[in-house]
Amino acid sequence: MADVEPEVAAAGVPKKRTFKKFAFKGVDLDALLDMSTDDLVKLFSSRIRRRFSRGLTRKPMALIKKLRKAKREAPAGEKPEPVRTHLRNMIIVPEMIGSIIGVYNGKTFNQVEIKPEMIGHYLAEFSISYKPVKHGRPGVGATHSSRFIPLK
C-alpha cells in the first residue's frame, strides 16, 4: 500500500518535459558561439576544413556582415529580416543561427531559417535547385516491347 501512494501523487502532477540540448560533435551551442574560428574548424569535416584553410573571400564575409546588421536592427524577440544571397556554397557557422536567409536556387529565393542542426552544412543543401521528377506513364519507344504496340 505504501508503494502505491507515491505513484498516485506523481501521476497527479504533470511531468516536466525535458528537451534535448543541442551539441555539435560533443560541444554545446554556447561553447560553439564563444569558440574561435581556428578551434571551430577543427570540429568540421575534412572538406570544410580544406575550404576554411584556403581562406574566406570577400563575398562570404559580406553576407555575414549583412546578417549581423539584420540581427542588430531586429526588435527584441522578433525574427530578423531575410537577407538574400546567391552564395549557395556558403558554410553555415554558429554565428548565423537564428538568421533568415533567402538562398537563390536559380529561379527564386527560398527562405531558410538557420537552426543549430545546420552547422557545418552548405546553404545549397536547404534550397533545392531542381524539381524532383514525377514519373508518368512511359511513352512509345520507352521499352523494346513497346515498339510493337500500334499507334492510336
Curated annotation (Swiss-Prot):
Its main location: cytoplasm. GO terms for biological process: translation. Keywords: Cytoplasm, Ribonucleoprotein, Ribosomal protein. InterPro entries: Ribosomal_uS19 (IPR002222), Ribosomal_uS19_CS (IPR020934), Ribosomal_uS19_euk/arc (IPR005713), Ribosomal_uS19_SF (IPR023575). Pfam families: Ribosomal_S19 (PF00203). It is found in: Cytoplasm. PROSITE patterns: RIBOSOMAL_S19. One of its GO terms (cellular component) is nucleolus. It comes from the Eukaryota. The keyword Kinase does not apply. The keyword Ribosomal protein applies. GO terms for molecular function: mRNA binding; structural constituent of ribosome. Belongs to the universal ribosomal protein uS19 family. PANTHER family: RIBOSOMAL PROTEIN S19P FAMILY MEMBER (PTHR11880), SMALL RIBOSOMAL SUBUNIT PROTEIN US19U-RELATED (PTHR11880:SF53). This is Small ribosomal subunit protein uS19x.
